[in-house]
Regions:
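Conserved tyrosine-mediated DNA breakage-rejoining catalytic core shared by Y-recombinases
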Residues: 120-124, 176-217
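Basic, Lys/Arg- and aromatic-enriched nucleic-acid-binding interface segment
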Residues: 86-89, 93-97, 108, 112-171, ...
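Alpha-helical scaffold segments in carbohydrate-active enzymes
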Residues: 43-50, 71, 75, 91, ...
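Helix-turn-helix-type domain boundary/helix-start signal
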Residues: 30, 59-62, 85, 135, ...
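Hydrophobic (often cysteine-bearing) scaffold residues that line and stabilize catalytic clefts
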Residues: 36, 40-43, 91, 95-98, ...
Length: 218
């Protein structure tokens, strides 16, 4: 009976439009923030556009696998976003990972097996050689920015930017920093900040470099 039931479930899933199912499920999910839901809906729209362009829409969950996701990655890399430019590597990786994250919600309801579809094997792409959209700052460049003589609002914005560079946190998490979460490092050497990131549920401890401490003391 178990095998008959499983076979019946598989046949039913083949008749389900995965994109519609994901969109409808997100609309009814009250466990996520409105901002997160809006972002997920936008990611589904991007994925739907890809499926339409490659002639694979509508699609069911049994046809969503790692090769398809890699095709989506290539599609994003080659899609122009303005005047001959293509989407930067980090953005491509983030878009693909968000789709996989959304699909994990479907796994919770038995619609897809992330391991069987090999989606858990996906790795974010490395920066492409000659990727003009990728912009990095060296430590020396960050130091030069911090050394600029600024006052008032410009100084505050510069300090916040440099602090984000050195602690690696998003703007909303950086804004939440206060004296109460600055602590001595467990090894007694230096200081750390302990925060619960906005999009995470666990506490993280981040070592503070001297320049970061200098900014926080202002």
């Amino acid at each position: 009976k178990k095998f008959i039931y499983k076979d019946t479930m598989e046949k039913e899933k083949q008749n389900i439009n995965a994109v519609h199912w994901l969109r409808n499920t997100l609309a009814l999910d009250r466990t996520i923030k409105d901002s997160t839901r809006a972002d997920y809906v936008k990611q589904i729209k991007f994925f739907e556009a890809f499926l339409n362009e490659v002639g694979k829409y509508p699609i069911n969950f049994s046809d969503i696998n790692l090769p398809l996701i890699k095709d989506y990655e290539s599609y994003l890399f080659n899609k122009e976003v303005g005047k001959g430019k293509t989407t930067k590597t980090t953005t491509v990786g983030n878009k693909v990972e968000k789709i996989i994250c959304i699909l994990k919600r479907a796994e919770q309801q038995g619609m897809i097996d992330i391991h069987e579809s090999k989606l858990d094997k996906y790795k974010k792409p490395q920066s492409r050689q000659g990727d003009e959209n990728e912009i990095y700052l060296t430590e020396d460049e960050i130091d030069k920015i911090y050394a600029l003589r600024l006052t008032g609002r410009e100084e505050e914005v510069r300090d916040l930017f440099v602090l984000q560079c050195w602690i690696g946190q998003r703007f909303s998490d950086t804004q939440a920093i206060n004296e109460g979460i600055i602590k001595e490092a467990p090894n007694g050497k230096g200081k750390v900040i302990e925060i619960v990131q906005e999009k995470k549920t666990h506490r993280v401890s981040i070592p503070l470099l001297p320049v970061a401490i200098d900014i926080l003391n202002k």
